[in-house]
Each structure stands twice: as structure tokens, then as C-alpha cells.
């Protein structure tokens, strides 16, 4: 899995701040072409979401850790930016709202909790659920998406590795190969 592989940058603690900033910028510069290579999947996911919203459904984001927080941020910005009601785009994070500010260890490993969290909102076949996971293998997210597909609920995924496990439980999956992080394993940086 590329996001978890060793960084190309060594001895970070010995570098000055300018070198650190330049190294991070070099890594980030690689992403534009990689995101562009997924344009058709990104467009397909947008079409899926649009069709569900047009039909009266809602958009749910599911994630753990930073991925869950990013879904919550986007859901929070949609009402003021696009004028949609606050209950139209909903972000859900493993571990509940307390995990927004403080990590809830091992919440991401629960295969069954994701669908239970969605059920609290009355998720149904009009809705679309997008899982967000840098690794593409987070049990909380995959379990929720699998349960949604079994119930006829549209699913999508946003992943930072190719050929992820999430692809198997998504109607549309965007898989951007972000590569190793500047700080090995720190997927909140680039992924």
C-alpha cells in the first residue's frame, strides 16, 4: 500500500525548516496529475451524487480519523456555500462526534458500527453514501458500504491507493495513488 510505504525523505529531524517545507511541497506537486488521471471516476461520482440529491435523497460521508473529519468539514460547508439544507449532506466519523476533536482509538476497526451510525439518520435507497479512507481498507467504512449495497443504497468511495478493498463495495470508487507520505504513514498530510 503506497500511502503506508517508506518516505523518500530521510533524516527529517536534521533538516532545516526551509528544506522541510520544500520537501513537502515537492510531494504535493505530484498530486495534480494523479488526481487528473481519475477525472472520469470523479465525474461519475458527481453524477451519482447529483442524481440522488435530485431524487430527494441525501449525501452521507463516512470515515475514520482524518478521513471522517474531512467528510464532516465538507458536509458543514455545503449549506453556506451551495444553499442546501443542513440535513442534506451529513458527515459521520467512526467514534461519534467526540472523535472530531479527540481520536477514539480502534473505532475504525468495528465492521458493524458504520451501518448502525447511518441507521440513526434513517439512511435509505434514495440516499448515497461515500466512504472516505486513505488506505481503502478501513473496516468501519467498508462494513457500512457493504451493508448499504445489500440494501440497495448507492455507494461511492474516495481512496488514496489503487485496487483498494473499498472498490468492491462501491458503485463508483475514486482511487488516487497519492504515494508515500513525506512523514512515513502520516496520511493526513498528502493522502
Task: Give the ranges of each region predicted by the language model.
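Cofactor-/ligand-binding subdomain signature composed of acidic, glycine-rich
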Residues: 1-34, 38
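Short secondary-structure boundary micro-motifs
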Residues: 6-7, 17-18, 35-36, 44, ...
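Short secondary-structure boundary/capping elements
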Residues: 12-16, 41, 106-113
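Flexible, glycine/charged-enriched surface loops at secondary-structure junctions
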Residues: 34, 42, 167
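A short, well-structured juxtamembrane/interface segment
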Residues: 37-52
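Glycine-rich phosphate-binding loops that contact phosphosugars or nucleotide phosphates
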Residues: 60-191
